[in-house]
Amino acid sequence: MSATGPISNYYVDSLINHESEDVLASRFTATGPISSSSRPTPLVPECADYPSCSFAPKPPVFTTSWAPVHSQSSVVYHPYTHQPHLGTDSRYVRSWLEPIPGTVSFPGYAGNSRHYGLKPDTFQDPRAGDCLGSNGRTYTDYLYCSAVDIREKQQNTPSPETESLSSGKHKDDKAELDPNNPVANWIHARSTRKKRCPYTKYQTLELEKEFLFNMYLTRDRRYEVARVLNLTERQVKIWFQNRRMKMKKMNKEKNDSKEQ
């Protein structure tokens, strides 16, 4: 087993030497019989015929180390440092970076803290009427009205949803009334009493004269008075009844006053 090391080394060396000899023979022999022990020529030509090329080492792109990242939760900061040797090469110019007009500092941090370059339109001043149009109130309502007035105004202003619900409710109530149900008709029935029609001064004066002559009218006389005063017989009859009741009340009050 100890002789396997030298034997294996000798076998490998012999294979390498034979391979190099076959390669040289196939390269420099233009015509000649190919021996059975020779190996096939390689398809890719060797580069020994061409002069060797040496490339100058190129300096690394980023020579300086990256700056440490400060943990800031409010602003996203990209720690990019300018490389002076990249100004001549246009491949490394970051064209997407826009010029920064100024720097913004944060007063909550120390005076020697880092200043971050921000655009002037990043933080816009809020306008007074931006957040007031969504709830239907204007800036003047908040300025001149109290909280109670605003709540009452919201409650008194009907919304389209409440109007639609109320109209639908009235329609349902009308549909529930059964014309064949006498109870429902009696509850929701309108008054059949005619509207009161007051007498004119001329009619009242003529009726008073007639009452002084006679407290009770016959049917013929009632018909004549109604025709003259442009009234119905029923109106004349009712007026005389009310006038008699009034006269009885007045006489009763007089008698009571005398007894006292």
Curated annotation (Swiss-Prot):
Protein origin, superkingdom: Eukaryota
Compartments, as annotated in UniProt: Nucleus
Keyword DNA-binding included in the entry's annotation: yes
Residue numbers spanned by region Disordered: 153-181
Keywords, sorted A to Z: Developmental protein, DNA-binding, Homeobox, Nucleus, Transcription, Transcription regulation
GO (cellular component) term, any one: nucleus
Record feature DNA-binding region, as residue ranges: 192-251
GO molecular function: DNA-binding transcription factor activity; DNA-binding transcription factor activity, RNA polymerase II-specific; RNA polymerase II cis-regulatory region sequence-specific DNA binding
Biased composition (Polar residues): 155-167
PROSITE patterns: HOMEOBOX_1, HOMEOBOX_2
The keyword Transcription regulation is annotated on this UniProt entry: yes
BP GO annotations: anterior/posterior pattern specification; DNA-templated transcription; embryonic skeletal system morphogenesis; negative regulation of vasculogenesis; positive regulation of lymphangiogenesis; proximal/distal pattern formation; regulation of transcription by RNA polymerase II
Family, similarity comment: Belongs to the Abd-B homeobox family.
Protein name according to UniProt: Homeobox protein Hox-C9a
